[in-house]
Amino acid sequence: MVFKSKLFFSSKKSRSSSPSSSNSPRSVGSDSPIRSDKKKPKSNSKEETRSPNTKKHVSAKGKEASLEVHSSSPGKSNSSSSGSEAKKPITETPATSDVKEESPASVSPIMASSLGLNRIKTRSGPLPQESFFSFENDYAIPVLPCYKLSKLDTGKKEAGSSKVDIGPLRSSNPALLASGTGQFKVSPTISGPEGSAEVCTPENSYDLDDPKESDSPRYQALLRMTSAPRKRFPGDIKSFSHELNSKGVRPFPLWKPRRLNNLEDILNLIRTKFDKAKEEVNSDLFAFGGDLLDIYDKNKESHPELLVTIEDLLVLAKTCAKTTSKEFWLQCEGIVQDLDDRRQELPPGVLKQLHTRMLFILTRCTRLLQFHKESWGQEEDAVQLRQSGVLHSADKRDPTGEVRDGKGSSTANALKVPSTKKAYSQEQRGLNWIEGFFVRPAPLSSPYNETSKDSESPANIDKMSSWKRLPSPASKGVQEAAVSKEQNDRKVEPPQVVKKLVAISDDMAVAKLPEVSSAKASQEHMSKNRHNISWGYWGHQSCISEESSIICRICEEEIPTTHVEDHSRICALADKYDQKGVGVDERLMAVAVTLEKITDNVIQKDSLAAVESPEGMKISNASLTEELDVLSPKLSDWSRRGSEDMLDCFPETDNSVFMDDMGCLPSMSCRTRFGPKSDQGMATSSAGSMTPRSPIPTPRPDPIELLLEGKGTFHDQDDFPQMSELADIARCAANAIPVDDQSIQLLLSCLEDLRVVIDRRKFDALIVETFGTRIEKLIQEKYLQLCELMDDEKGTIIDEDAPLEDDVVRSLRTSPVHLRDRISIDDFEVMKSISRGAFGHVILARKNTTGDLFAIKVLRKADMIRKNAVESILAERDILINARNPFVVRFFYSFTCSENLYLVMEYLNGGDFYSMLRKIGCLDEANARVYIAEVVLALEYLHSEGVVHRDLKPDNLLIAHDGHVKLTDFGLSKVGLINNTDDLSGPVSSATSLLVEEKPKLPTLDHKRSAVGTPDYLAPEILLGTGHGATADWWSVGIILYEFLVGIPPFNADHPQQIFDNILNRNIQWPPVPEDMSHEARDLIDRLLTEDPHQRLGARGAAEVKQHSFFKDIDWNTLAQQKAAFVPDSENAFDTSYFQSRYSWNYSGERCFPTNENEDSSEGDSLCGSSGRLSNHHDEGVDIPCGPAEFETSVSENYPFDNFSFKNLSQLAYINYNLMSKGHKDETQPSLQRR
C-alpha cells in the first residue's frame, strides 16, 4: 500500500534524527540499526517494535501543530551532552516541504487494527475501544491517563488551570479519535536551552479535512501540558493501551517496563541503605577521630615518629566524614584500598591497629557497594542510561533526519567513556592517600554515563571488591565460596555470579590501572607485605590472613587453610626432588614417575572403592615411595650409623629417611623408626614418649603423622587427567637434548603447556598445582642451564622473550641450580646473638618469608676441620633430622656457605637450666623430680634409637615456653671422643662454684674446657677412654640431679685435675639427709653414680630408672600434659633475658664481644642448640654470617660439607598443622614457636 509505505517512511524520517540510534550504544530493549540502514523499510518496523519510547495518542489534525513544534532552527536542534534539563519557549517554524509532500492531503481514518498498529509500543492485549467501550460508531475515544495529565498540569501553572476536564475532552474533541492511528512521542527530559523544540514529535500522523482543529483551545491546552518539562523518567511513561489494562495484560516480550521499574526500586533501595550506612560511618569516624586525638596527645613526646601517620589518619577520617554520600559511593573503594596498602606495610603495633579500625569502619560502605555491583551492576547500566536522558533527549532530532556532527556526536561519544563507577576509575585510583584526602567532585554524568558494552565486559563488571588485592591461585576458590555464602545470606542469587567472579579474577590484571601492572606482581607484593611482619613464633596465630590462607612452610607459597594437611603431604612429596643431589633431568623423570604412580593408585582406589574397607581405600604407601629406592637406597640398620661408612652414606639417605617417615610408619604404633608420635604435634613442647618401654597413649591420632604416612585420601581425584599431562610434560622436558638447537623452544613450549594445565586445575594447592609448580621450576632451571651452554649468537633467544626470562630469573632466585644454595643466611633476618660456643655462636633470626623465629647455630668450618670435629657436626645434624620426640629440640634447616655451617632449630625462650640455677640457686625436690623425669624420657627415646648424648649438663637442657624440658646439643653424640690427645689441664672449671657469691671474679676468670666435654658431668669410662656407652648418660643424670638439689656439681674443684680425681675416686660431698636431700633422692643419685657402668642404674634400660622409688609419684603416661612448675614469662618474642651465659657478653649489631679481661677467653658455653665444648685455642674470633658474596663461593671438594644442606620436611609440615590447630587462640598473647 502506498499509504502504508509512506506512513512508515514518515516515521523513519522523524526517528532518524535521534542521536541515540546513531552513535549511542543500544540500550535495554532497543535494537536500532546503524545509520547506513536507515532507508530500509523493514528496519523501521523493527525500530518501532523495539523502541523503549512510549507514545501519546493524538488526532490526525494534530500533525500541523506537531510539525510546527517539531521544526526548529538548525542551530537549536543540536543540544549538549550534559543531560541537564531546561525549559525553553516553543518556537514555531515552517515545516520542511519534503515532509509535507510525502503526506497525503486527505486520507480516510483507518482503524489501527487494520494496519497492525495496535501492537506498536503497546501491550499485546485487545484494543481499548473493543474491550472497554461499546460505542456504536467506528471510532472509539481514547482514554488519556489521568495521573499523567494531573502531574503535567501541576508542573505547568501557566497552562491556565490546575485541572483538565477529562470528561468534555473525551466526548467533544474529535481530534482525539482513533487512538491507534496517530501517536506522538513525549520526551519529558528537555536538555539544553532548546529542550522544548521537540516536545511533540509525531511518528504516525494523518492530514485530515479540518485544518483548524489544531487551533482548538482544548488541543492547545493539552499541547502545552504535554510540552512542559517533567521530572518523571522515561521509564515511567507508559502507552495508553498499557494504562487501560495494566493488570492482567501480558507484558510485551521485547520491553518490560515493569521489570525495569522493579529494578529501579531495588537500586534506589540499595542507595538508600548506602546513605544510611554513610551516616553510621560518619558517626564512627567522629568517634575514631576523638580517639586519634587522645593517642596523639599521649604519644606527642614519647613516640614522635607516630605523629605524622596519626595526623594523616585524622585528615582522612575528617575528609571521609565530610564527603557526600554520592561522592563516597565513587571514592570509597579507592580510599579503602590505599588504606589497606599502608596497613600491610606497617609492623604490628598501634599504627596497624588504628589502620585496621578505620578499615573496619569504612568497609561498612564498601561491602554494600560490593554486593550491589556483584548483584545488579550489569542490569543497572540500562536504568542509568534511561535515567540520564541521553538516549531520549528530544533535542537530538532534526526534521531532515540527519545527525549533526557537532555537539550531537560528542554526546554519543561521551557514552563510550569508561565507567567511572566501576573499578573506581582513574580519578579514584589517583587519590593519593596522604596528599589526596580531599574529595574531587565527580562529573555529573559519571555515575550514569555507562554503556551496555562496558557493563558486559568481564573486566568492567565490578571487581568483586576492587580494593582487595588480586587473589592468588591458592585463595581464589576460598574467595568464591565466601562470596557465594554472602550471596546466600542476603538471599540474592543472581545468575552467573560465580562465573563473573572467575572472570574478574582472571581479568583484573588487565582491567586495573597501571599502578598494578599484573597479577603476578600483585601476588608477590601481597605475599611480601602480609608475611614480612613480626609474627615470629607460629604457635598462636589466630588471624592467619584476611583470605583464610597461610604460607606453607615447605614451599613458602600461599595455600587455602582447607587444604593444609593434604597440601603438606603432597608438597613434601614434591619437594624431596629438590633435596636430591641429582641433575635436573633425573628430578624431572622422578616427578613424572611419581605422578604416574599417584594416578594409577587413584584409578585402582576407585575400582576397589565398592569392596574395600576404609583402610583399604587409602593410597598405597609403598607405591608412592618406590621411586625413592632407585634414587636413594634406604638405610635399614640404624646401629651402623656410628660407623664410618654410615657417615659416608648418610647424606644420601636423607630423603629415604623422610619417606620412611611418610610411608613406613605403622599406624598408631608405640615405637616407630623415628621415635614416638606426639599427641599434640607442635601444640606442645612436651607431648610425651611412645617408646616401647614406656608408651604414652595419645588421645587422638596425630594428623601430621597420618599425613606423612600417606594415609590421607586425595581430594583431587578428578584431576588425574591433568596429572597425566603433567607427567608427559615433565618427561618431555627431561628428554630435551642440551646440544639440540630446538631445546630452548621445546622447553618454552613445555612451560606454556604447563601453565595451561595448571590453570585448568579443579583444586588449589593440591597435586596439580603443587607438582606443576615444581615442574615449572625444574624446567626453568634447565632452561637457564641450556642458555649458558648456547653461544652468544643463540643467546638472543632470551631477549626475544623477555616475560619468560623474567619468570626464569624469578624461579632461579627461589630454586637455585646448586643444591647447597637452595637456602642461605640471606633468607633470615638476624635479630640478636644468644650465646657463644666452641666453634661458633647461636643467633636469633627471623625467616623473611614467614616471620617465624629460629635459633641458628653458626659453626666455622675451619675450626671444625682443624679440631677434627667434622664427624661430630655431621652426626649432630643427622640426629636432629631423625629426632621425633617432644623432649628433643626440633631441627628445620641446615645449609652452608664458604666459611660457616648453619643449623636452624626451634627457638626456646625459657633459657637453660644453668641460667635458672644461677638465678635461683637450687630447686626443691618436687620440681627437680619432674624435670629429671622428663630427661629420663628423652634419654629413653634416644637410647632406643641407638643414640648416646655423652654431653648432658644443665647448659644443654632448655626450657620451652610451656616450661617443659628439651634436650639439645648432640655434638658429642655417637662419635665419642673427638680428640683423645686433648688434656684436661687448665684453669678451674666454671661449674666448680656456681652459686658462691663470695667469688665475684667468676665471670672474668679464664675458664677452659676440653673438647671432650665438661669434666664435671663426664662418666669415668669417658675420662679414661675405656667406654662410651649409654650408661654414660645415666651418670650425667645423677650429676644433674645432685646439682638441682644442692646447687653445685658433686665433684666440683678449683682445677680440672682435681675434678678428674674426684670423679675417679668418687669423692662426693653429700648434704645432710633428710634435711637437704631425701633418702630416695640420695639413693637414686648414689646408684646412678656407680663407677662400674655395668652395675650402674640404667644399664638394663630406662625402665629400672623409672621404677625407682624417687619417681613413685610420677605418672609417666601423662607427664607431657602436666603443667610445669615454671612457665617463662617473656616480654616479647625476641626476649632472651632467660639466657645467662657463663660469661657476660655485650651485644653490638650482629657481634658478640666478651667482657673478659683476657681476650683469649673468647669461648663460652652454648645456651640454645649450640655445643658446650670450649676450645683451648686462643685465635677463635666471633662468627659472622656469610654475606651474599661469600655464599656464592664454592666449597673445596676436599671438605665433606657438600651435602650438608637439608630441609626437614616433616617438621615444617608440623608448623603448617600447628598454624591450623592454634588458629583459634588470641594472637595478642605472647608465645614463642614450639612443636
Curated annotation (Swiss-Prot):
Enzyme Commission identifier(s):
2.7.11.1
EC class of the enzyme, as a word: transferase
GO function term, MF aspect, one: protein serine/threonine kinase activity
Locations of Low complexity compositional bias?
Answer: 1-33, 71-84
Name all AGC-kinase C-terminal domain ranges. Answer: 1112-1216
InterPro entries registered for this protein in UniProt: AGC-kinase_C, Kinase-like_dom_sf, Prot_kinase_dom, Ser/Thr_kinase_AS, Ser_Thr_kinase_AGC
Q: Where are the zinc fingers (C2H2-type)?
A: 552-571
- Where is the PTM Phosphoserine found along the chain? S32, S1010
> What chemistry does it catalyse, as a reaction equation?
L-seryl-[protein] + ATP = O-phospho-L-seryl-[protein] + ADP + H(+); L-threonyl-[protein] + ATP = O-phospho-L-threonyl-[protein] + ADP + H(+)
Recorded GO CC terms: root hair
- Renumbered to this chain, region (Disordered) spans 1-111, 187-214, 387-413, 445-494, 675-699, 1155-1174
Spell out the family assignment given in the record's similarity comment. Belongs to the protein kinase superfamily. AGC Ser/Thr protein kinase family.
Q: What is this protein called?
A: Probable serine/threonine protein kinase IRE3
What species was this sequence derived from? Arabidopsis thaliana
Q: What is the lineage of its organism?
A: Eukaryota, Viridiplantae, Streptophyta, Embryophyta, Tracheophyta
